[in-house]
A protein has these predicted regions:
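Non-transmembrane, aqueous-exposed alpha-helical and coiled segments at domain scale
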Residues: 1-424
């Protein structure tokens, strides 16, 4: 069976959760391969509206195995809370449909505290962190200063390892930031409250995935955030601290030999962004407020108002290229229905020169948008269910974007519900 990756093409918040929720009926396994509790995937179904920060979006589909891979920042506190929320809606969560890689590293209480302390230290130079501990976590992971989930199964080893980490981390907290630090008793209490509830789900998911692959099962890799937030290929340093691109999915999932047959890139019909950094086509004032309200553009995790503007075709084409997208899902087309004409950022002007190539981050700060305008359709399209019934101006807009980014748009969403998706 074919494997698929669902990834963001832009800054994140493109609507990946609804696409995973829609497509999971075709797959046996859904794997999260990077990131932690710092971003949310919104899913709307007959049970309600859910913002999933760690759980794979396949949890709502009976018979689908959901896996948190070794590349994930395993935030036990957020995960336990999320599982309780899902269960309260009548969704079963057990090791029969959720597994956690024994090689996933734990995001510990001090990671979140260090994140907030560093943002406070940076003041007006902050990166716009969600303060969920992601950067300190990945920093520790690459310094080999974390606890792996598999260690939860070996309490004596875990306690000794934690004691070593505690001494070093308290030196940083106390001497660099002037913070209080932690005691061993506090950490043990945290482990007993949260990590103990995750322990039953810990397994050798790499072996499980290899067996699933050998048995011909189909696997979906669910990405978090978008290409422009990738640590290596994004707008550095205003990125996340992991690799969000599809090429990393097999590694972070725990199945490095996997072949990805299809990469579905998710693109919003306009631009939105949470956090700091260059955002070339940003709107301000009344125009921004109207688009933000129309699209309900507030962070799923933080609730922060998102920065918004017209679709950025330069950034989107770059995202398509680095993600290796083979198909595009264009979301929230219905939000643009109030516009008489739809603006698009077709190119950048940098130092008096026009370019359609996405520049190096230091140069991006100088970019100015070169705008074009497409006819609006000025009618509600949220009830449209076939491409043929779409207003001609809306179809023209989709085809214009498709040609500009160089990738087929196979899905167009006109609402948040499962059925509000048009397949081309």
């Amino acid at each position: 069976m074919a494997n698929c990756a669902i990834v963001g093409i832009n800054w994140g918040d493109e609507g990946k959760g609804r696409m995973v929720d829609y497509l999971t009926g075709q797959y046996d396994v859904v794997v999260r391969y990077q990131g932690g509790g710092n971003a949310g995937h919104t899913v709307i179904n007959d049970r309600g509206k859910f913002a999933l920060h760690l759980l794979p979006s396949g949890v709502f589909r009976p018979g689908v195995m959901n896996i948190l891979g070794n590349g994930v920042a395993l935030d036990c506190e957020n995960l336990v809370t999320e599982m309780e929320t899902i269960r309260s809606a009548g969704v079963g969560i057990s090791p029969e449909n959720l597994l956690v890689s024994h090689r996933a590293s734990l995001l510990l209480p001090w990671h979140r505290e260090l994140d907030a302390l560093e943002e406070a230290r940076l003041k007006d130079k902050m990166y716009g962190s969600t303060k969920q501990g992601i950067a300190p976590f990945y920093s520790d992971k690459y310094q080999k200063k974390t606890i792996q989930a598999g260690e939860l199964l070996y309490p004596a080893h875990l306690k000794a390892h934690l004691q070593d980490l505690l001494e070093r981390k308290n030196l940083i907290l106390q001497r660099v930031y002037g913070a209080k630090g932690y005691t061993m008793e506090e950490l043990i209490a945290w482990l007993e409250t949260y990590a103990a509830q995750v322990r039953p789900y810990v397994a050798d998911t790499g072996r499980w995935l290899r067996q699933a692959q050998a048995a011909g099962k189909s696997i979906m890799f669910e990405g978090q955030l978008g290409a422009l937030r990738d640590l290596d290929y994004g707008i550095y340093p205003y990125t996340t601290s992991s690799n969000t691109i599809a090429a990393y999915a097999p590694i972070g999932a725990g199945l490095p030999t996997a072949k990805i047959d299809q990469v579905v890139g998710v693109v919003k019909a306009y631009s939105s962004c949470v956090g700091e950094g260059p955002f070339t086509c940003e709107w301000f004032g009344a125009d921004a407020d109207k688009l933000r309200e129309a699209g309900a553009e507030y962070g799923a995790k933080t609730g922060r108002p998102r920065r918004v503007g017209p679709i950025d075709l330069v950034a989107t084409r770059y995202g398509v290229e680095v993600q290796g997208a083979t198909n595009i899902a264009l979301t929230k087309l219905d939000i643009l229905s109030y516009m008489d004409e739809v603006p698009v950022c077709a190119a950048y002007e940098i130092d008096g020169r026009i370019t359609r190539e996405f520049p190096f981050p230091a140069v991006l700060e100088k970019a100015k948008p070169v705008m074009e305008y497409r006819p609006g359709w000025c009618c509600d399209i949220s009830a449209v269910r076939t491409w043929e019934d779409m207003p001609q101006a809306a179809r023209d807009y989709v085809e214009y974007v498709e040609q500009a980014i160089g990738c087929h748009i196979g899905y167009v969403s006109v609402g948040a519900e499962r059925e509000s998706l048009i397949v081309r």
